[in-house]
Amino acid sequence: MRRSLAPSQRGPLRPESRHSFTPPLLKKNKRSCQQELEREQELDRRRLGALRDASNTSELPLPIRFTANSEYELAIAKVLARKFKVPMDNYVPDYGGKRVLGVRRCISRRPLHDPMACNALVLFHPPAYTEHERMGMDPTKVLVHVVVDPLLSNILRPHQREGVRFMYECVEGKRGNFNGCIMADEMGLGKTLQCVTLVWTLLRQGPECKPTINKAIVVSPSSLVKNWEKEFTKWLHGRLLCLPMEGGTKENTIRALEQFSMTSARLGTPVLLISYETFRIYAEILCKYEVGMVICDEGHRLKNSDNLTYQALMGLKTKRRVLLSGTPIQNDLTEYYSLVNFVNPEMLGTAAVFKRNFESAILRGQNTDSTEQERQRAIEKTQELIGLVDQCIIRRTNQILTKYLPVKFEMVICAKLTAIQLELYTNFLKSDQVRRSLADCNEKASLTALADITTLKKICSHPDLIYEKLTAREKGFENSQNVLPSNYKPKDLNPELSGKFMLLDFMLAAIRAEGNDKVVLISNYTQTLDLFEQLARKRKYGFVRLDGTMSIKKRSKVVDRFNDPESDSFLFMLSSKAGGCGLNLIGANRLFMFDPDWNPANDEQAMARVWRDGQKKPCYIYRLVASGSIEEKILQRQTHKKSLSSTIIDNNESAEKHFTRDDLKDLFTFDANILSDTHDKLKCKRCVQNIQMKPPPEDTDCTSHLSQWYHCSNNRGLPDNILAQAWMDCKCVSFVFHHRSQAQEIVPSAEEEATDQPEEKPESRKRSSTPASDDSADEDFRGF
């Protein structure tokens, strides 16, 4: 048929045919309708005949005019009345397939996902109405269930489902008159996945049958921006597009942020991923307009309410604030107050009111020399504070992971100083330099004292780290030039000059010889990483190194290469300041923490690199400290801080309180003949002359206080044959604390449950790529 004969080319339709089909019986009586139908059928027969004749001649027929009563229109109406069928194999619709083509959906509200489906996670339940009440209600105002997308609810673990529900109730004001919360889960519990679930749910639905928010902002360290984008893509399979702010010119960044901020309608990229530094620079743009919700990853960066980043984020026009931090208390309660005040302003009052009502009383009761009245008041104030913050904080420990992960053995190893280290250490303590530092020391330790502390820590690691000070005859080393042996070579590492390095060398050799385990070596100093490199080259071990000088893109490749079972990398050398947070190093199952940090959170983050989802082997964590030295004093300071965190965050009233502030001030004392200064200060009742006579309580594990661990003054009873053999061979170990996690339960991991997801290599979460200076490890030191 020629195209000019097509109905669309034959002129306009009759006016009545432009509307939807209306049965003629509604307008005319039966007889007139029958007559009109017969006339239309006769006209249709004539038109069809004209079309057949026109196909053989050049003559054009009269214009074809379809009416609402034609058989053609009746057929179309029947097609449109059919049930809508999704063209997918084995597709089962949520509501019985009641949708039809061409018909406007029913105006009655219903949830986006079926609340009665198997494994459904319902975040909001509407009020239960009787049928009589429903008859008198406006169907367009009925509240509906808020149900998490089955794509996510089917892979969430029980504690993650609880976390999503808690955060939803907080941001929606269901748990008091506040809209913020702190997700304080420890590392490895899936805080990112829980936040992805929350954001996706709020962007898609709400009780009013419409999205709760139209956009959200995720603020994180710069090295985590790309990882957040990959996490959204991984869990949502590309259903949500994000706007990552990394790189790019200033003009392009301003244009993108202005477009994101000004648009109030639904965006194509409703989630902005931005670093703390970039947010601070462009805060003026982002704070002009309202935003649905803000999420702050690694939220302990906001511990100081006076810094510019904190103040910029406080200016953001949003009531829904979520802060992620596995360590909300790192140093003191003032920092904790800053975090709570960020998510829920005025919950705890002003800073002065908080200090007067809570902080002073709690800290006085924490000291061992406190009176009974002070301890009782501290308990009362602690319970009062817990009652307030419980409305907005959720905290789960790594204990949950025991059912998903292999067993973990954690050991604190006290290594003896060598004769050379001992002479350098004692000479420095007796020097005029240290005496002047102690004389000037006040509530906030002077910069000179901090430098002296760093020097002592380096002596504990290896004399090579202070070689330049020795040759330059700096203050404190005027009488130590002849301590090093005559054959000493600064660029040729000699492990025998350090007790910790000698132990490390023995253990690495045994691990390499006895199996295919891989090892992570962590230090707070890049100079120590240089010594690790020298040792690896000397023993011909394959290794990779990650510190602050490595670009973010290269980090991901390095991690993937190390985790590959086929790679020849035996060691992963890591700077805790540059990459101790978020890296997934499950290719290794042994980790050495070579030197302690003042902040226990930094050490905890670094030591969580191997015992994570995907780990298949038993894990061994070794923490090395020099016996009786300042490193043990730092370990004791960590115990004090963890006791405070345990009391406030974990609601553990029986947290041990063994160290007074006077004990913690005693940094520059040293006893060369002691097995473990920490064990002596514990005043352990289970040991007699440093020999354990009674095992720890059965309900304890490696998360318990050191006083509840196993205590070993010899190599008998150690859980690790490698350490037991090294203790006997190198004779440089004086004491060991050790414990293990609870037994593993056979439970599928999240990756195994998500069978419908494409395989993807684990993505690492990285910290800022700013190079870490050697002295940065003491930035969290506080005066006692």
From Swiss-Prot:
Q: Which Gene3D superfamilies match?
A: P-loop containing nucleotide triphosphate hydrolases, SWI2/SNF2 ATPases, N-terminal domain, Tandem AAA-ATPase domain
Annotated region Disordered: the residues are 1-36, 745-784
GO process terms (BP):
cell division; chromatin remodeling; DNA synthesis involved in double-strand break repair via homologous recombination; dorsal appendage formation; double-strand break repair; double-strand break repair via homologous recombination; double-strand break repair via synthesis-dependent strand annealing; intracellular mRNA localization
Q: Which residues carry this modification: Phosphoserine?
A: S20
Classification via InterPro entries = Helicase_ATP-bd, Helicase_C-like, P-loop_NTPase, SNF2-like_sf, SNF2/RAD54-like_C, SNF2_N, SNF2_RAD54_helicase_repair
EC category name:
hydrolase
Keywords, comma-separated and alphabetical: ATP-binding, Cell cycle, Cell division, DNA damage, DNA repair, DNA-binding, Helicase, Hydrolase, Meiosis, Mitosis, Nucleotide-binding, Nucleus, Phosphoprotein
Q: Where is this motif: DEGH box?
A: 297-300
Which amino acids does the record list as binding ATP? Answer: D185, E186, M187, G188, L189, G190, K191, T192
The entry's localization annotation reads: Nucleus
Q: Does the keyword Cell division apply?
A: yes
Q: How does it assemble?
A: Interacts (via N-terminus) with spn-A/Rad51.
The job of this chain, per UniProt, is described as: Involved in mitotic DNA repair and meiotic recombination. Functions in the recombinational DNA repair pathway. Essential for interhomolog gene conversion (GC), but may have a less important role in intersister GC than spn-A/Rad51. In the presence of DNA, spn-A/Rad51 enhances the ATPase activity of okr/Rad54.
Q: What is this protein called?
A: DNA repair and recombination protein RAD54-like
Native species: Drosophila melanogaster (Fruit fly)
Taxonomic lineage of this organism? Eukaryota, Metazoa, Ecdysozoa, Arthropoda, Hexapoda
